[in-house]
């Protein structure tokens, strides 16, 4: 455990650049970059950004994957006073366009080729970025992101079909980072050697880069091209000298498909941090068998409260006695309550909505006052957020999770609004009406997404089999929907059931799909 408190993220990184300039900060498949390089490259880019005369504090999109240039761009933008918006290069075109429409960025930094031409904003291409890094421009930090300034903006799924940009300030980030590097639950090692697998557009990434940069460690990036290829994934993981693993439970489930993923093969891997979706007893038990001495940490929290608000180290007793793992003890600076439908606090043991308050709560959604007003409020004098999650609190202060209150789900770590999936399905030329429904396994975890579909007149006659219709729909929507949002099974109906007030009966369909 670090027993250290940082006051400024950039100042901390700058100090490491002085104290350990030759120490690796980033290792992507053997390509190594040091703290000294990170300072030099981010200084050069920050100086260049100042010369562009962008609107002060305006957000900037950074487009790419797990490349080192992503991190260097983030640091440069923070130094020059700009919030950054990470967009993963595997994003669907329509999602990218929707983010640009909402965010109105002043600039795009394209670490990978940006798929949209004729933008209304300037674009720094990767070839230009390389030249900027080579210039080795010096930089005086005097208007960096600080205090309540927005540090980054992560876009999540939105109920209107438009993504919501969660604004996280420097103060929000410090609240999370200082808790993580000091909390007994995490027991974060000094100079952590950390797996960097979740994309930067997913706020779980903050759980690896923030503590690593705060403690002078090394990030070991694992690009999606590797994770998508089982053989390469297993070969690569076994060669990484990582001590800390941060991922969704789904990703470690994938890793455990290899018998070689164990403590004998990876003796240096001693810490596992999980967030982004529910860690089931089944997954935790299997991991404990593979890594008997490792620390398995279950963390919980919405993007809107800066990554996580509670955590605990899973014990053998929990694995023996719990049907559902507790989601942890809450951060000391973030009072967390359970409330009923009227907004009144509930006693310990009673289930209601989890409300988080305190300095890690976001200021709201970028350029979306209506959605901000609906989700964010003041509770007992502190900024607070409606998580939309059901939960209860034990007398010992342990938070228990009870599932989602609405139709928003977690699937493979991604937060998905079922309504957004349904809206996208309805954009297909073949579909008259469609809804998306999750199927849960016995561990209360989303197993897959199903689509109930009513086809347009004449479509069925165009194809020999239902499978061919499904293939055509998926091809039709490949530029509209992210891969993880695409239902794995399509069920074709003549009509969809309605509720008494004329809405599609999604709850009824969910019951049908999930009945024993």
UniProtKB/Swiss-Prot annotation:
EC supergroup of this enzyme: ligase
Catalytic activity: holo-[D-alanyl-carrier protein] + D-alanine + ATP = D-alanyl-[D-alanyl-carrier protein] + AMP + diphosphate
Binding site for D-alanine: 203, 307, 503
Keywords attached to this entry: ATP-binding, Cytoplasm, Ligase, Nucleotide-binding
EC number(s) reported in the record: 6.2.1.54
Matching Pfam families: AMP-binding, AMP-binding_C
Record: residues binding ATP: 156-157, 298-303, 389, 401-404, 503
Listed transmembrane segments: none
Function text: Catalyzes the first step in the D-alanylation of lipoteichoic acid (LTA), the activation of D-alanine and its transfer onto the D-alanyl carrier protein (Dcp) DltC. In an ATP-dependent two-step reaction, forms a high energy D-alanyl-AMP intermediate, followed by transfer of the D-alanyl residue as a thiol ester to the phosphopantheinyl prosthetic group of the Dcp. D-alanylation of LTA plays an important role in modulating the properties of the cell wall in Gram-positive bacteria, influencing the net charge of the cell wall.
HAMAP family recorded: DltA
Family per similarity comment: Belongs to the ATP-dependent AMP-binding enzyme family. DltA subfamily.
NCBIfam families reported for this sequence: AA-adenyl-dom, D-ala-DACP-lig, PRK04813.1
Protein name: D-alanine--D-alanyl carrier protein ligase
